[in-house]
Amino acid sequence: MYFTEITMKNLFYGLLLTLLFTTTPAAAYNSSDLNQLMSSGSCAYGDLSGADLSSLDLTGANLTGSNLTGARLIKTKLAGAVFDKAVLTKTVLTDAELANTSFKAAQLNYTNFSGSDLKTADFTQANAFRAKFANCDLQFAVFYLTNLQEATLDSSNCLEADLTQANLSYAWLYNTNLHEAVLVYANLFNAKMNNANLSNANLTGATLSQALLQNANLNNAMLDKAVLDQTDFKGASMNFTDFGTAFKTEAIFE
């Protein structure tokens, strides 16, 4: 009898654990907020966390202050949408149409924008720690005072983007086009920028200590007052590069 009771208890707890770990969790979003978005195209300060909004046309949507944590917006049309102060932690926005969008002061930690059109998007003061912008069109985008620490921007087009005072420490910018980009007083400590195009870029006062710029294009770039402690420029093209009063302590040029 005693053995049978123990066996039954073990079976019960085993079944309970199985249910706990295999049952699919319910969607976290608020149904009324989702309905509002679907009917009006906007949902400011709503809870849309975990919602799948992929391939929808949400052009110009107002999503100010909304919670979109873990939501999926793959190939979604969002040109001109407003995400100011919204939370998009671990949100997937790959291959989306996001031109002219606003992400001012938004939380974008671990957000995946890979392959998206983000021309003229505004990320002023957004927090985008470890966000992914690989292969994105970021022409004329604004990243003023944006936290992009450990973010990935490999092979993205950042033509004339404004990254003034942005934190790009430990960021990945392999093969990134930063032609005529503004990186004044940006933090690029230990950034990986091999093969990047920084021609005509303004890096005045930028911190590039321990950054990798091997085989990068720095033709006509401005680096006055930049901090270049142990920066690796091996193989870089530097025709008419203006170092001005840059701090070149132990910089590596060959």
Residues of each region from the PLM?
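Absolute protein N-terminus
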Residues: 8, 28-29
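Sec-dependent signal peptide recognition
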Residues: 9-16
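Extracellular polysaccharide-degrading/modifying enzymes targeting complex plant/algal/animal polysaccharides
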Residues: 18-20
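N-terminal signal peptide c-region/cleavage motif recognized by signal peptidases
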Residues: 23-25
